[in-house]
């Protein structure tokens, strides 16, 4: 059986945000006993990631690392009409990725003890983000 749902995440400021609870709240219940969850964000200036869910410093450090790797206001950027944060946001989105696949075991997401699902927002004002969740089971 395959199920699919689309939902909107609340707008977030720039940075890495733990969204595991928001994802779980929007998934159809019950989840299959065994399967896969694919999450896809329908935008080009944010990303999805799995990372540590306990220490908030990880979230701020990830933002700092991405800003170090992909800097704003580089003179070689051609795509600049939408603001200094736009082209770097597209590059960061490509580096991180816009989809995740998570195993489902015993009707629950089979994440590690310290793993959480992140929305990485790379725009200063990215707005609400749309997620497509496809459940295979």
For every predicted segment, state its role:
Residues 1-137:
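Active-site histidine-anchored catalytic micro-motif
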């Amino acid at each position: 059986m395959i199920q699919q749902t689309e939902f909107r995440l609340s707008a977030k400021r720039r940075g890495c945000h733990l969204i595991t609870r928001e994802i779980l709240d929007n998934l159809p219940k019950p989840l299959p006993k065994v399967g896969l969850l694919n999450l896809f964000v329908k935008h080009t200036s944010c990303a999805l990631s799995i990372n540590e869910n306990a220490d908030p410093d990880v979230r701020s450090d990830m933002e700092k690392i991405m800003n170090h790797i992909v800097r704003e206001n580089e003179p070689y950027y051609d795509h600049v009409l939408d603001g200094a944060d736009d082209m770097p946001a597209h590059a960061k989105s490509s580096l991180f990725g816009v989809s995740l696949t998570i195993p489902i075991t015993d009707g629950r997401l089979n994440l590690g003890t310290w793993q959480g699902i992140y929305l990485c927002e790379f725009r200063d004002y990215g707005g609400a983000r749309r997620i497509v969740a496809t459940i295979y089971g």
